[in-house]
Amino acid sequence: MDKDKYVKFSVSYLFSIKIDDKYLLVHSRRKNTYQPIGGCYKFFDSAVPLLLKLGCIPADKDPFDLRIFVPEASVPEFSDWLASGKDRENTFEREFFEEMFIENKYLNIEDFGFPEFNKVQDGYVNIKYDDFYKIKSAYPMDIVSVTLSDSQKEQIKKVVESGKTPFIFATESDIKKGEVLVNGKVVPIGSHTKKILQTSPKSLVLA
């Protein structure tokens, strides 16, 4: 694959979970940073014919993740398809429950119940050169606000306050500074975390 002729897309969503004026973040072992809970959207089998026609190539070990190399000439049509929401995930429950109940198992799904998810900002396509991957890239991220009951808030607070989990609370100031104090050590917060502070609407369009 000639990287110069492709744009790497990673289409994802981040959860803005706010309790007592602080935001819930999770530790990323890969980067040793704290970041919002979130994940990559998946596309469905029904999208495969279009993606093949556009010349797209999977960029991840999971071939249905929307981490994908798109030929530059196909970017406008691919962006239109993303904005349509057709043949891909448009809900957020899967990643939330995977992170909170399956991978980490610090909460009981039967006791916790189902929170309310509201997308407050659409991701937008802004193509930039990624110095790490050495390729033109676009990382549209939807921001999803999670509304919790008082009981759900208390359950999460107990998990965080135990100090034995990958979760922490960070203030808006921490997030803007890009670092937070954890167990007496200053730990970086991922730069993309600032996006959960944004609530102004943006549409998924080609920038």
Residue ranges and their predicted role:
Residues M1:
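Extended, Lys/Arg-enriched charged tracts that mediate electrostatic binding to polyanionic substrates
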Residues V11-I19:
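Short beta-strand scaffold segments in enzyme catalytic cores
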Residues S10-V11, Y139:
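Short, surface-exposed coil-to-beta transition loops
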Residues E98-K153:
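Acidic, glycine-rich loop-and-strand cores that form catalytic or ligand-binding grooves
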Residues D4, R67-S84, I135-A207:
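Nudix hydrolase/Nudix homology domain
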Residues D21-N108:
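Conserved Nudix-box catalytic region and its N-terminal flanking loop in Nudix hydrolases
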